[in-house]
Amino acid sequence: MECVRSGSGVLDPRCSPRFLGKKGGSLTSCGKATSTNLAICTKHEQNLHGNVKPSQLAASGSSYSVHRSPVLKQRQNLSARSTSADVYTTFDENVRAVSSHAAEEKVGVLLLNLGGPETLDDVQPFLFNLFADPDIIRLPRLFRFLQRPLAKLISTFRAPKSKEGYASIGGGSPLRKITDEQANALKVALKKKNLNANIYVGMRYWYPFTEEAIDQIKKDKITKLVVLPLYPQYSISTSGSSIRVLQNIVKEDSYFAGLPISIIESWYQRDGYVKSMADLIEKELSIFSNPEEVMIFFSAHGVPLTYVTDAGDPYRDQMEDCIALIMGELKSRGILNSHTLAYQSRVGPVQWLKPYTDEVLVELGQQGVKSLLAVPVSFVSEHIETLEEIDMEYKELALESGIENWGRVPALGCTSSFISDLADAVVEALPSASALVTKKVDESDSDMDLMHYLSKMFFGSILAFVLLLSPRLISAFRNTLL
C-alpha cells in the first residue's frame, strides 16, 4: 500500500552514525548503503539500557525491568504472535536465489525504530522506557543510579499531557502498524530482487522490543543479518541508541558474536530516498494555487545542542546535507522555491538545535510569508510528531501568525520508490557483512576534566529535567507547602 495525502490535505487513514561516543572505535560512514564493522566504544550497564523481558532478568540476575502496563502484560503473548505472523514470515523457498551460495544462506533484515504507545494506558510506561535510556538523559557514570528515578519522575508528570496528544490522534501511535506494513512491503521488494529474507521489527521503547526481534532471529537461525535503522539521518539518540542495544547483545551472545552483520548507519544521501522526498514535495506543491510562491519548510526532530558540540553527534551536519540534496533534486526539476530548516519537539530549558520550529513559524508570518509547505524530514512514518505536533499545533500557530495557506508533505510510509530503494540498500550491504568487532571500553566518560564534566553534565541534566516538569511540578510543590 502506498501512503499518500489527498489533495484536501487529509491523511489516508490506512497510513494511520557515525558517532558512538568520543572514545574508542567508531562507525565509519556507510555511504550508499555499504556496511561497516562495529567497534564497541561505549559501555552501558544492562540494567540501565536494555528493555529486557522478565525471563531474561531471572537468568541474568539483573535488577532492571521494563515498566509495563497491566493491559500489555495480558496481551504480551498475543503481541509476540501477531508480530511473528505479520513480519517474520519467510519467502517461498522455491523462489530462485541469486546464486547457489546465496540460496544456502538465511538472510535477515532487522528494522529498528522508536516505538510508540498503542493505547493511552501505554503512555506512561512508554515514557519511562524513553527517559530510562542513558542516550536520552545523559548522566555521568557516577550518577547513573539516578537514571530510573528520574525516568519515573519525568514520565509520571509528563504522561497526562502526552495522553492528551495521543487522544487527539485516535488514542495511540500508528507507528507499529505502519512499520509492520513497511516490513512486509520490503519483504516483497526484496523478493522481486531475487532475495529471500526474513524481516524483523525491533522497537527501542515499546513492543516489539529489539530484544524480542533478536530472540526470533536466533530461533530462525539467520546466517547473515542486515541492520537498517528507519532513521534517514544518524543521531546518538535514535540509531545510536538502538545500535548500542545490539552491541550489548553481541558482547554476551556467542551466536551474534559470530554472525555476519551489516549496519546501514544512515541513508539520507541515497538517490532513491532523495527522489522519493522530492516527488512528495512536488506533488504537494502542485495543490497550491501559486506553487512558485510557497516556502518549503523542513521541520526536523531536534536534539540538545550538547549532543553535537560535546558528544560529536553528526545529526545536524547530516540534516543540512539532506536538505541540500533534496533541494538540489527539486532544482533539477525546475522547482526553485525558497526553503528553510527548523527543529521541533524540544523540551526543557536547555538549548537544543536552532532555529526552533515554533519561533520560525511566527517570524515567517511577521515577514509576510503567506504560503507554507511543511516537510517532516526526520520521519518516514506518521506518528504523534507529525499527526499532532505538526498537523495541529504548528498549523494553528502558523495560521495565527499570518500564514494563510498551509500544506504538509506526508511521511514516506510505504511509497513504492522509497521501499524499493531500501531494498537496494539491503542488497548492496550484504556482500560486506562480517562479524561485529567488540572492544573493551575505557571506563572514563570523556576527555574532559572530571570536575568540569561532572558539574556540567550532572547538575545541568538534573536542573533541565526537573524544570521540564514545570509548571505542574511547581504547582504540586506549592500546593503541598500551602
From Swiss-Prot:
Gene3D superfamilies referenced in this protein's UniProt entry, alphabetically: 3.40.50.1400
One annotated Gene Ontology cellular component of this protein: chloroplast
Compartments where found: Plastid, Chloroplast
Protein family according to the UniProt entry: Belongs to the ferrochelatase family.
Function: Catalyzes the ferrous insertion into protoporphyrin IX.
Transmembrane segment boundaries: none
Reactions the enzyme catalyzes: heme b + 2 H(+) = protoporphyrin IX + Fe(2+)
Keywords: Chloroplast, Heme biosynthesis, Iron, Lyase, Plastid, Porphyrin biosynthesis, Transit peptide
Pfam families (alphabetical): Ferrochelatase
Domain of life: Eukaryota
Pathway(s) per entry: Porphyrin-containing compound metabolism; protoheme biosynthesis; protoheme from protoporphyrin-IX: step 1/1
GO molecular function: ferrochelatase activity
SUPFAM superfamilies attached to this UniProt entry: Chelatase
Gene Ontology BP annotations: heme biosynthetic process
Protein name: Ferrochelatase-1, chloroplastic
Entry EC number(s): 4.98.1.1
